[in-house]
Amino acid sequence: MSNPRPNPGIEAIHPYIGGESKLPGVEQVIKLSSNEGAFGPPPAAQQAYLKAVSSLHRYPDGGSHALREAIGRYFGLDPARIVCGVGSDEMIAHLCMAYSNPDSELIMSVHGFSVYEMYGHYAGAKVVKVPEQALTTDVDALLDAITPRTKVVCIANPNNPTGTMLPTAEIARLRASLPSDVLLVLDAAYAEYVDDPDYDPGVKLVDAGDNTVMTRTFSKIFGLGGLRLGWAYAPPAIVDVLNRVRGPFTVNAAVQEAAIGALEEPGWVERSRAHNSAARAKLATALFDIGIPTLPSVTNFLLADFGSEARAGAADRWLRTRGLIVRRVASYGLPAYLRITIGTNEECDLVAEALRAFMAQAPADSDAAS
């Protein structure tokens, strides 16, 4: 007698492991491992969430109508082309499942966000990872990987975990060169942090055609990671597909109210972005001065190069003993790097001071520092 077996591809999935938030024996922990907003949730979001508590016995608006209207007003988008879900990763999962199959291929960058591979395997598709140039998505490599079986291309722009971005012209070139029946998913989770004028999160391409989707999140600059809310902006036909496959009440009522409050907090994004840009530049300079180069980043994190896996591991252990949690990225094929979230000024200073002490005592390629 045989046991139940999952669909092909499921056993190829490596479960996603989020950034740690606690350390054994350490009371005061500073978490800089998950790229969460430095300032927490906006006050208006907190107030709206608490106000919603008295109505928790009511089912939420399954279509998130008021929230979609608020998103549309804030970003200047048509609410009818917005779909909300439990994090942008849920939107990406639905897109991969709806447009991929066991006879198809999903294309992604070799150091792209790991959920693309996860959901590609979930759909049974062959996942093809293409090389990058200087840890930046390579459009020519993506195009070279396209075959008649390709159905979905997933790109994070800016990319996690590298922090690098493709300019508007390169993304437009990618879309123009892809076959029209290939869905391009642009994951713009970090869009609000970008202050480069040569950047578009994907709105223009979504508006221009029928085969591109942009996904966004409230988990980063809006500080609502614990509530899990994301959204997609898509052509009408793809919106119809997402509304067919999404759950009926996935976005709960309190989350919808909190997100509307976050959008209504005056100047929140502008203040957060200004802080992030200044703190990121300061930390990058401090790390460079002690011999730790970082990749050029437009996000709320830095990818720091320690030169070897041994030294990166030693630095991580050194930070952990001091209550500082950053992110190992060996699972992304980057064993010599640590990803460091941009926190408050004080938190960034503590990281710089701790790593200065580490570099002062650590021999080259040491794995013994503690």
UniProtKB/Swiss-Prot annotation:
The answer, when asked if Transferase is one of the entry's keywords, is: yes
**What EC number(s) does this enzyme carry?**
2.6.1.9
Keywords from UniProt, A to Z, are: Amino-acid biosynthesis, Aminotransferase, Histidine biosynthesis, Pyridoxal phosphate, Transferase
- Which EC main class describes this enzyme? transferase
Catalyses which reaction(s):
L-histidinol phosphate + 2-oxoglutarate = 3-(imidazol-4-yl)-2-oxopropyl phosphate + L-glutamate
Cofactor(s) recorded for this entry are: pyridoxal 5'-phosphate
Under the heading Pfam families, the entry gives: Aminotran_1_2
Question: What is one GO biological process annotated to this record?
Answer: L-histidine biosynthetic process
Q: State a single Gene Ontology molecular function.
A: pyridoxal phosphate binding
| UniProt xrefs under CDD domains | AAT_like (cd00609)
Q: Which residues carry this modification: N6-(pyridoxal phosphate)lysine?
A: 220
Q: Which InterPro entries match?
A: Aminotransferase_I/II_large (IPR004839), HisP_aminotrans (IPR005861), HistidinolP_aminotransfase (IPR050106), PyrdxlP-dep_Trfase (IPR015424), PyrdxlP-dep_Trfase_major (IPR015421), PyrdxlP-dep_Trfase_small (IPR015422)
- Annotated pathway: Amino-acid biosynthesis; L-histidine biosynthesis; L-histidine from 5-phospho-alpha-D-ribose 1-diphosphate: step 7/9
The Swiss-Prot or TrEMBL record describes its family as follows:
Belongs to the class-II pyridoxal-phosphate-dependent aminotransferase family. Histidinol-phosphate aminotransferase subfamily.
Question: How does this chain assemble?
Answer: Homodimer.
Which protein are we looking at? Answer: Histidinol-phosphate aminotransferase
